[in-house]
From Swiss-Prot:
InterPro entries: Chaperonin_GroES, Chaperonin_GroES_sf, Chaprnonin_Cpn10_CS, GroES-like_sf. This is Co-chaperonin GroES. Heptamer of 7 subunits arranged in a ring. Interacts with the chaperonin GroEL. One of its GO terms (biological process) is chaperone cofactor-dependent protein refolding. Pfam families: Cpn10. PANTHER family: 10 KDA HEAT SHOCK PROTEIN, CO-CHAPERONIN GROES. HAMAP family: CH10. GO terms for molecular function: ATP binding; metal ion binding; protein folding chaperone; protein-folding chaperone binding; unfolded protein binding. The gene is groES. It is found in: Cytoplasm. It comes from the Bacteria. Its main location: cytoplasm. GO terms for cellular component: cytoplasm. Coiled coil: none annotated.
Length: 97
């Protein structure tokens, strides 16, 4: 199954959780924080402006992005994988390089 977001929404595959702290302590799955970064796997067609024009999104498939800890509260399971669906304005930055 393929997920196609509408308008200014994006679908993000969350990065793997960190299982160790910087000090080397191994965290159980329940104690590890969910990462606030991921890779865009699908984008919508764009935001519809008041005048009817469609503004294309500033992000594209394959971009690595950072989002807030409470962003992407819409989790969808597709082919056994949890994906986040969020509006483009919930993305804080694109990771370059």
């Amino acid at each position: 199954m393929k997920l196609r977001p509408l308008h200014d929404r994006v679908v993000i595959r969350r990065s793997e959780e960190e299982s160790k702290t910087a000090g080397g302590i191994v965290l159980p799955g329940s104690a590890a924080e969910k990462p606030n970064r991921g890779e865009i796997v699908a984008v919508g067609t764009g935001r519809v402006l008041d005048n009817g024009e469609v503004r294309a999104l500033a992000v594209k498939v394959g971009d690595k992005v950072v989002f807030g800890p409470y962003s992407g509260s819409n989790t969808v399971k597709v082919d056994g994988e949890d994906l986040l669906v969020m509006a483009e304005n919930e993305i804080l930055a694109v990771i370059e390089g």
